[in-house]
Amino acid sequence: MANGNFKLSQLLNVDEMSAEQRSHFFDLMLTKPDCEIGQMMQRVVVDKVDDMIRERKTKDPVIVHEVLSQKEQNKLMEIYPEFNIVFKDDKNMVHGFAAAERKLQALLLLDRVPALQEVDDIGGQWSFWVTRGEKRIHSCCPNLDIRDDQREISRQIFLTAIGDQARSGKRQMSENELWMYDQFRKNIAAPNAVRCNNTYHGCTCRGFSDGKKKGAQYAIALHSLYDFKLKDLMATMVEKKTKVGHAAMLFAPESMLVDEGPLPSVDGYYMKKNGKIYFGFEKDPSFSYIHDWEEYKKYLLGKPVSYQGNVFYFEPWQVRGDTMLFSIYRIAGVPRRSLSSQEYYRRIYISRWENMVVVPIFDLVESTRELVKKDLFVEKQFMDKCLDYIARLSDQQLTISNVKSYLSSNNWVLFINGAAVKNKQSVDSRDLQLLAQTLLVKEQVARPVMRELREAILTETKPITSLTDVLGLISRKMWKQFANKIAVGGFVGMVGTLIGFYPKKVLTWAKDTPNGPELCYENSHKTKVIVFLSVVYAIGGITLMRRDIRDGLVKKLCDMFDIKRGAHVLDVENPCRYYDINDFFSSLYSASESGETVLPDLSEVKAKSDKLLQQKKEIADEFLSAKFSNYSGSSVRTSPPSVVGSSRSGLGLLLEDSNVLTQARVGVSRKVADEEIMEQFLSGLIDTEAEIDEVVPAFSAECERGETSGTKVLCNLLTPPGFENVLPAVKPLVSKGKTVKRVDYFQVMGGERLPKRPVVSGDDSVDARREFLYYLDAERVAQNDEIMSLYRDYSRGVIRTGGQNYPHGLGVWDVEMKNWCIRPVVTEHAYVSNPDKRMDDWSGYLEVAVWERGMLVNDFAVERMSDYVIVCDQTYLCNNRLILDNLSALDLGPVNCSFELVDGVPGCGKSTMIVNSANPCVDVVLSTGRAATDDLIERFASKGFPCKLKRRVKTVDSFLMHCVDGSLTGDVLHFDEALMAHAGMVYFCAQIAGAKRCICQGDQNQISFKPRVSQVDLRFSSLVGKFDIVTEKRETYRSPADVAAVLNKYYTGDVRTHNATANSMTVRKIVSKEQVSLKPGAQYITFLQSEKKELVNLLALRKVAAKVSTVHESQGETFKDVVLVRTKPTDDSIARGREYLIVALSRHTQSLVYETVKEDDVSKEIRESAALTKAALARFFVTETVLXRFRSRFDVFRHHEGPCAVPDSGTITDLEMWYDALFPGNSLRDSSLDGYLVATTDCNLRLDNVTIKSGNWKDKFAEKETFLKPVIRTAMPDKRKTTQLESLLALQKRNQAAPDLQENVHATVLIEETMKKLKSVVYDVGKIRADPIVNRAQMERWWRNQSTAVQAKVVADVRELHEIDYSSYMFMIKSDVKPKTDLTPQFEYSALQTVVYHEKLINSLFGPIFKEINERKLDAMQPHFVFNTRMTSSDLNDRVKFLNTEAAYDFVEIDMSKFDKSANRFHLQLQLEIYRLFGLDEWAAFLWEVSHTQTTVRDIQNGMMAHIWYQQKSGDADTYNANSDRTLCALLSELPLEKAVMVTYGGDDSLIAFPRGTQFVDPCPKLATKWNFECKIFKYDVPMFCGKFLLKTSSCYEFVPDPVKVLTKLGKKSIKDVQHLAEIYISLNDSNRALGNYMVVSKLSESVSDRYLYKGDSVHALCALWKHIKSFTALCTLFRDENDKELNPAKVDWKKAQRAVSNFYDW
């Protein structure tokens, strides 16, 4: 029956039986099928099945191609039983159920139309009608947005496919279908009788009649009326004389009550926000559907509406799932009859709200202290019981704890008359608390005690309503008008200094004192109402406002100042009550309104509104013009883009929300009569007008000379009589004759190039400052490129909404909707990027961001036509842009100042020296860090200096941003941690301060200046070697003796300490971040920012209050106890260098615990210092004398013998002992149960943006397999079971452990430079082919190379290109664990390797393309570049034979970790450029970009889904080649490969041979900051590539596999039988033939000693290894069968084994 798609309830009327009857029925059917009643029941079932089959055969079949689950198929048949649905399951697409449902709904609508009548399809499904031959239907398909364009293209492709099938004979077309198909023959995109791209209102395809458009009498609309206003629909139906429209639309009646809810039948949801309603589908990557809420509500309510003498009547006739099917009738010439409020919503059934009531609850917004209301849905029984209980409490019992206790105890089970009744829907715990508070307040308000208390409070206070404060506010508004007048009169830019209107703290209460009323300040909601309404009525009294105008003005003010009105404020006069659901719905449906008032003529409403606004404006202008003859209320201000926003005039100016009294404060000085106030106030305004007239001409002339970037009005505030002005005087920004720009916005130009290096002058101070400006400008350009790249990707749809963990902290703000499209993780950015679409390239502006409760409230310039603005990490702080603006105006002559350096060890008292030697009243004191600056200010304050210390002691950034006008100068400049700053910054500080002497505190061995732009080469960044005087300090007051012992190795002179602590440092080994010890109040220090983020999240999750900083951030600070943490096992050459080691170990005074996942130089130093005796440590105290130290030196000689035959010697014991000597303890570790223990014990994982499906755990450990038992015990891991937990572990340790090392990079420039180098160094330009790749022969060749299984999967998938989700990937894990050749297997549980791959259909699209591209790359590559792709050992040896054994080479190995996961947007763009170089089409490039940007991975087997950005997918169509290209490009960018003799690369492995003595800089820092690669550089005596040593023999170079890895793999525990072992033997024997040469064996012995730090000789073990490899009989002795018996070598089919082993056999 399941195959027939029938449900059991359809076979018999089971639903009409009682529960007992159903039980008997199933018992007889299942337990007694042979009894008479059972047989009768079976016959009934068979007859019923036959009847249903016959009935279905009479129906026309409806073919559903979408892939649906069995549950969805059953649901579809249950909702639409009238159709004979045939499921093909050959079209996989997003929200397939909804797509299939639309076809059936379209047929339902068409069935309502007479068979021979013409039909207009509004927003129609014309491609569906073509397949059914419905030639009477004309579809109006307007392209309103990009989604409609995409659908139109999809339909055209579908139509083309139908034609192709008809021509090939695969499809038979009916006569009607052929007619409809012929309409598209001339031009598929042109309008025709079948469809047009006009709106229903604009469609003229049926011609005209009497000057009006003709249309069909019937219309249908399938999910398209959302986008049509009801008025437009009615107007069109009237004009085209359409009688009836049948429609279907998603029906969400719950949206009238709650803002968000489910649409269960389509697995979707709705959401109301900002006047819009959103429809979307769960677990769906596509965009949501957005519609106007007010228009949707009209269709939802379905009220009869009259229009131009016609009444439009809504008739809802069926609800199918979440879709309402209804008709709109146009009725002419009859009086309208209204519906009662009970006729519509009473029929709507919402099952989860049955017997529930609506209860208002109240909450207080913590940030604003504003009372808000929301509706809560509670069971009526529960609510009645709670109200009854609270009403019976006495005054002493009426407490919040009692109310909460009762509500909580009855939330799940309600006790009525002693019986327990389970609540149908319990209340959320948070809402339950709010309900308790609301019910308590209701009861307390109802009792007279609270009334007496309120009266007592009101008698003790007196609100202010005098005219004095009112006129104070109005006067400032007048100054705003004058500022606008200056801007208009001078035709200049924005007004720089604004005077505002809205005080942060408004006047609230006053008390009578002998000196007059004393004002108090408080953020009071009530007082805002009093003050601002007083302003309105004061103005109204002057201008004789009419009542309606005044009321409108009051409403405007209330909206502007967020003074809420209405039901959300708790009304104590009307206690809280609840409403029945149906009554609540019915209250929304008003039947008393006439048709004309339900939908008024909008043009008339607009005219009335404009007239009312004009009256308000004229009244406001009347008052201003009466006092100021030059005032013009109609003036329009024109200005360049500004963050200040557009200026208004007239009434708009008076009502504008600004922030002026935040800069001015007023205080009461004396009591003045109202008459005196009014007289002096008005006279003051007249006097001020004369002053303004004098300012305008001079200011306009200044602007015309171009000496300022914007208008700056510097004038005194007008102070009403009785008040004194306490606003500090404003000083202009002037620097040595030049005007310093005060920038409110920055221009962001797309395609900007990095600036050119400045010319070297020969003067260090000049060159350093020029370079500093060059660096700041390069940083600005790189940041602009990153900002515009993010906006470009969002605009093109590469970055989409609905994702997680957006790159660079991206946030996208919709300017029109005033809401976040993509909400950033953090807000309060200093600037916001506002692109300007008027420009040809991607350009725009950075504007100062204005925030309010996490939302942007900027008034963006409309003329730029930007729909969206963005924020990101690059806009969070823009201090360097302001500094660049300020410093660019300064002269760059030589600095006449002497520079001194106090070079001291950590904790030597450099800050103390500043405090003791500096006088902040006359000297300038600067520091590079905020914490250090605050510490200096605090210590100066303790010494009692009379000056304002915060004005004299500053951070360097603050000094350069605010003091370039010469406001802070001194003869002596004290600069703390000067070596952390760029030398040019120090010179600038000395120049601005006018210093003659600069005393710099620093340490040449600690962290120096680190540039944030990787592409610039700085030559003058350091002051080291340029000081006039250097004073060394080698005594530390901070560091204990063991730290002093470590520091003594790195400093000249002897380091001594005053700290009495001897031993302070310990090492604690951890496996992961979960094991980090959590100590409240401790100071945690990490090496990397990524480690800091992990630790901050861990502390927050565990609710531990502690501070976390990086080593760089902690330089210059002191802590008592420090926990130094390393959670990343990979080595970073930047953050783990010597200077970081010194800073990390010298921050504490008492204790340091180093918790690390890996042994490194830091742990080595700590262990060595801990091993020192007390006597050894005593010499590092200040009181001890210096002891002499001696060291011995031994010369090492190595004797090398010539070649000879390899002896056939050695035993298994020799191999085991050699392995134990290399890796002590590895063979003792039994890992066979590791996977089982992990799977069956608790495991705490923290994963971001991961969805898991519970119940997918399967006990795979019960599956028993038999394997051979290895005799040799190595750390070869056991084969793992691929469980859900293993998938999550692998995802966490691999895909979610991506490094984030890249600094600011101008990606466009770096890509261009890299491509230029590729063409000049790697490829022969003459051999590069860029012709199109689309070639049938290439496709067929790729197809023939695929397996039969792959071909079958591709053929079975019949989706078209537009139906494929390219950003969706499959996820799996490998069960084999990669073996390690170190000691980590003893304590580390290795994560399995992950494979992220596309579907076969997508690979079949890209596979042939990339195969051709890679062949073209190999053909064009220079011969000394060796790309290890599909090469055997012999092939690789042949490619390196050209190396001369007589020549001397320097071999360089670069080891990169987390290579796939390091990819970001820059890598993707570079890869696309390489593809384009070799002929990739733009359409394929776009699809590839989309498929690698914002991606979703799904592990179907283990029930897991995650979101990943940009990472190179390990299983897509070009993984290995793309990785290899990235490796080559990175090395090409940072190493002089043009000098290389040989470059061998493949994947993330590389080996480069340079001529001996070639000089180059360590590339690892640049590979990290420019390319985001964690890497290490190796220079061993014997190089290695892809697990093979490159040995130099007497005649050539030769690659030989690493014997240590070979021996490790001989401990493999997953070899099935002797036949499998024979296959391994063939592969081993072939790849390790070089072990038969003793010259190779001896050199391998040296290689092992060099690589693995092995002090012994390995020749005997290598001989034993060759002995067991060269003979299969000997190899069999290394294994036993499952019964622990020896293997029989004779039981092998060698022919079968030979066939199984290919050139690339991997065992």
Curated annotation (Swiss-Prot):
Gene Ontology biological process terms from the UniProt entry: DNA-templated transcription; methylation; mRNA modification; RNA processing; viral RNA genome replication
Region (Methyltransferase) location: 65-425
Pfam annotation, one family: RdRP_2
Catalytically driven reaction(s): ATP + H2O = ADP + phosphate + H(+); RNA(n) + a ribonucleoside 5'-triphosphate = RNA(n+1) + diphosphate
Keyword Nucleotide-binding: yes
Coiled-coil intervals: 601-622
Note: The replicase large subunit is translated as a fusion protein by episodic readthrough of a termination codon. When readthrough of the terminator codon TGA occurs between the codons for 1187-Lys and 1189-Arg, this results in the addition of the RdRp region.
Protein family (similarity comment): Belongs to the ssRNA positive-strand viruses RNA-directed RNA polymerase family.
Identification of the protein by name: Replicase large subunit
Native source species: Tobacco rattle virus (isolate PpK20)
Upper classification of the organism: Viruses, Riboviria, Orthornavirae, Kitrinoviricota, Alsuviricetes
